[in-house]
Amino acid sequence: MQTEHVILLNAQGVPTGTLEKYAAHTADTLLHLAFSSWLFNAKGQLLVTRRALSKKAWPGVWTNSVCGHPQLGESNEDAVIRRCRYELGVEITPPESIYPDFRYRATDPNGIVENEVCPVFAARTTSALQINDDEVMDYQWCDLADVLHGIDATPWAFSPWMVMQAANSEARKLLSAFAQHN
């Protein structure tokens, strides 16, 4: 895969430039555009993934299915499709917006900061997973209710963005509705 970049944003969310992805994530990460996706199977189960230990931020942490950064000229939806192919080896249904105005800042235990405007999407797949070990070290298909209960009971066991997304009542309601429509 070619070198990825992030689209830098000002405080109003207007693009101001780009920066190489690895260089962008530091202790002083600038605000940039990202996306987060929750992927469901035909049974309505959520794919929860564990980030590879080689990841710069939050290595080994359990999180939602796929996250990434749209590239210049690429829609968020196309970026979700691209990253699902790259990380999971799957084709998906057109991504549906779940939490379009999600924005967060969090610092991992190593001091790496995520600072993102990060619209959240949900999609489905019926494909068999072909996991990219550079991105994902483990995964599990789970009932959404069990995952949400786990997040509520042990938020420290999940990525901060997943916890924050699940804490939004409207996003939680939309994810639950999405999971039930098999």
Swiss-Prot record:
Subcellular location: Cytoplasm
UniProt-annotated binding residues for Mg(2+): E87
Function statement: Catalyzes the 1,3-allylic rearrangement of the homoallylic substrate isopentenyl (IPP) to its highly electrophilic allylic isomer, dimethylallyl diphosphate (DMAPP).
Subunit structure: Homodimer.
Keywords: Cytoplasm, Isomerase, Isoprene biosynthesis, Magnesium, Manganese, Metal-binding
GO biological process, one term: dimethylallyl diphosphate biosynthetic process
Gene name per UniProt: idi
Catalytic activity entry: isopentenyl diphosphate = dimethylallyl diphosphate
GO cellular component, one term: cytoplasm
Cofactor(s) needed by this chain: Mg(2+); Mn(2+)
Residues the record lists as binding Mn(2+): H25, H32, H69, E114, E116
Protein's name in the database: Isopentenyl-diphosphate Delta-isomerase
UniProt record similarity statement: Belongs to the IPP isomerase type 1 family.
UniProt cross-references to PROSITE patterns, sorted A to Z: NUDIX (PS51462)
